[in-house]
């Protein structure tokens, strides 16, 4: 049985991680931390977990207790894992970080986007970017895994086949992405209030979103060179979901794009390439660790449109983190993650 610790268990990614781990036959949550809710029972805060974690309480972070776990997940704001990850690694504990702390390979680039110095630059060289569809073999040997963000997951999975094959003009890619409000976190913010977010949609961070360098980094690796990416995120009046509409110029009209995508993801348990002409919906992935993709070439022209949808809290966060844990410990990748999406 894998002994699990969770740092920061009161946010949406934390409770989603608890929900998924409750269904995992080879993992047990030993420690969950929250400074603000120390002493509160998990099941009292989240009644949906009653019967699964009735005796588990939030506690103040303690490196000794966390270090006794086999793996510790960080479901925290950026900057928190910087301070604790090194001590846990020294204790022999593996770390899976759901925050942005170790996603970017360049400490200075991270500092520019997050407005503070990187707190653990010495760990960046060994941090493995936890996108299993790209880095599965590296994940198996990792001590420190950086779980990709939600927008980066949907965008990279949608564009990687075109870039790996050298088909797309990498200098002019567009990612037009929509997110549910849970992507903004559980903290109280005016923009997340029902009366502000309901019955409305808006673009934000058009000048530059923190996920932009992460997406660009992954696409550069896929293409083997520089990329030019325009990324525009939008907030939509739904709780869960990412819908990415991706545009790429592909001059070669003889390529069977459907076959290309199907071949690339044929052995991927959590990527579903839908039949030609499909339009994947966010509701089709709600609660599931899956990315559904459809590829189109409108009017047979040079512009290819890829539609990519995920649940931002599952394949875009906690589910992908659990997928990484399964790989890391040599388990079936699908363990605890094979349930169907929720409909309606």
Swiss-Prot record:
Protein name: N-acetyl-gamma-glutamyl-phosphate reductase
Protein family (similarity comment): Belongs to the NAGSA dehydrogenase family. Type 1 subfamily.
Gene Ontology annotations of biological process type: L-arginine biosynthetic process
Pathway: Amino-acid biosynthesis; L-arginine biosynthesis; N(2)-acetyl-L-ornithine from L-glutamate: step 3/4
PROSITE patterns xref list: ARGC
Membrane-spanning residues: none
Domain of life: Bacteria
Keyword NADP: yes
Cystine pairs: none
Keyword Lipid metabolism: no
Molecular function (Gene Ontology), one example: N-acetyl-gamma-glutamyl-phosphate reductase activity
Location(s), subcellular: Cytoplasm
HAMAP family with a match to the protein in the record: ArgC_type1 (MF_00150)
SMART domains xrefs: Semialdhyde_dh
Active-site residues, record numbering mapped to chain: 150
Keyword annotations from UniProtKB, A to Z: Amino-acid biosynthesis, Arginine biosynthesis, Cytoplasm, NADP, Oxidoreductase
GO cellular component: cytoplasm
Chain's role: Catalyzes the NADPH-dependent reduction of N-acetyl-5-glutamyl phosphate to yield N-acetyl-L-glutamate 5-semialdehyde.
PANTHER family xref list: N-ACETYL-GAMMA-GLUTAMYL-PHOSPHATE REDUCTASE, CHLOROPLASTIC-RELATED, N-ACETYL-GAMMA-GLUTAMYL-PHOSPHATE REDUCTASE, CHLOROPLASTIC-RELATED-RELATED
